[in-house]
Amino acid sequence: MRVLNGVHQIKIPAPGNASWTTNAYVIESSNGHGHILVDSGWDSQESLWALQEGIRAANLKLRDIKTVVITHIHPDHYGLSSKIKQICGAQLAIHRIDADIILPRYKDFNDLVKKITVMLQQNGVPDDELPQLIDASLWMNKYVTPATPDVKLEDGDTISNGSFKFEVLWTPGHSPGHICLYEQDRKFILTGDHVLYDTNPHVGFNPQSGDNPLDDYISSLEKLERLKVHFILPGHGPVFNALGLRIEKILQHHEERKRAIMRSLHDGLKTAYEIAQQIPWMVNGGSTAFRDLSAWDKRMAITESIAHLKLLMKEDRVSNVDMDGASLYLAKD
């Protein structure tokens, strides 16, 4: 589907779930430099078919894609990139930080699982609940064939195909090496999962997230606020505008979440797991109690709670103590 002149959005379905889609974007070149593909979808037959059909519908050819840019290395954005490289010989570009965690995330996965398990234990998850929280994400790795990038991007780099010229904006938070692509002349931006139309992107603490991912994320949002943008092309959902208003709403959400955490701490020391149990969570547009969440959503709720606690500690509103191997938090005000 053409969303702007020379820019086509292709919805890539998740394996076995056609309603969960990732937006890939094809950026046309009119002078023979080759098209740019931004994000690829999962490494599945359904994803490949959807991509091929979307390219055909745009009257383009897959073999004319010469550059694949990945906004971040989560499976739904990065998984198919290796196969695309094989098919059309495209150059793969990923931010340096995400490029450097491909190996531990996808090839040395058992070591990462051990680190996640220890992190969840330290933050109060009972031993009998650990297996389901860990297993909730293992299926995703089946749909990623790790691909080594040809180019490791940095903040401020330029990507061009002769028709479009993008500035690479490093926007950590959702992933430590997440990037957005800003087309200054045409005033549009591809935001990956950094800014979405009506969903607050997941920002959780984990062994690969960096020390304070929510602080990084908020700084990245403020970085985008300064841009002149007419159209936002996100990694999920529809194209939209009013970037400043959307950022304001996301920031309000995180302020509300911090207030909810502070309320939960007023009656004493708690682990992140205990805090997550006391906070309402939004799932599919509705408020859901922690006990009713899926295993995957519970894990995200816990890691998001840790991320907010890390930020509250930086703001000197929360203190942290270790007690018998558990990480406990206490409100300062």
Model-derived regions: residue spans:
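Conserved beta-strand hairpin/beta-sheet module of binuclear metal-dependent hydrolase folds
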Residues: 1-58, 90, 181-197
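Residue-level signal for inorganic ion chemistry
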Residues: 6, 236, 261, 312
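Active-site HxH/HxHxD metal-binding segment of metal-dependent hydrolases
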Residues: 42-48, 56-160, 187
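C-terminal regulatory/interaction regions
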Residues: 263-333
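Metallo-beta-lactamase
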Residues: 35-37, 42-45, 139-148, 164-258
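Short, contiguous alpha-helical
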Residues: 86, 171, 313
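Histidine-centered divalent metal-coordination motifs
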Residues: 71-77, 95, 174, 178, ...
